[in-house]
């Protein structure tokens, strides 16, 4: 399905949604298509192994692929580094939504148009497992990610999770999580990304601004003029 943008003086791309049956093979193919990373490299990523087990436990049934998606954090990365590269990089990401129920585009259209289907928006929200932003860069492409936690079993504790609001084709959904993303060795190494994740918790508790990973890196090196350039970044 395709969502047309509202009228504006600024040209926008059409937002498209693809509905796929979940499988780790489908997820791997999406990563390969969205990033241009060879399949064998994706297969070696620990993230794919992690997602496979995680979505098995959460009983994922459907992937909704939203393209193009504008991600604030990556847009900052893009303007700080990628737009200046000799190689041309896209500034638009993809966002993958996961559900624990089967869902087709036709069925979703009915929900949007009439809201009278057997599955309500509330039931859709109950089935929502969260999202993964896929950045259009090779290798370190896992962007802002908010996924539902494992069910409480007395052994795991998630004290700093909170609700994130998600707009899916205009439908307001929520997922209780703590956002994280893969470290980007170009603009934000492990320390910057770890601080960004910590800020996801403290911002909810103390109502402060969450700087992007590239802003964290810039702040860290502002008063320490290293001999090497800041980007690509080798760590704080």
Where are these regions (language model features)?
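A sequence-composition feature that detects small, non-aromatic residues
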Residues: 26-29, 34, 43, 60, ...
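Cysteine protease-like catalytic core of ubiquitin/ubiquitin-like
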Residues: 124-173, 177
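Active-site nucleophile-adjacent alpha helix/oxyanion-hole segment immediately C-terminal to the catalytic cysteine
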Residues: 3-6, 10, 14, 156-228
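Long, charge-dense tracts
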Residues: 1-146
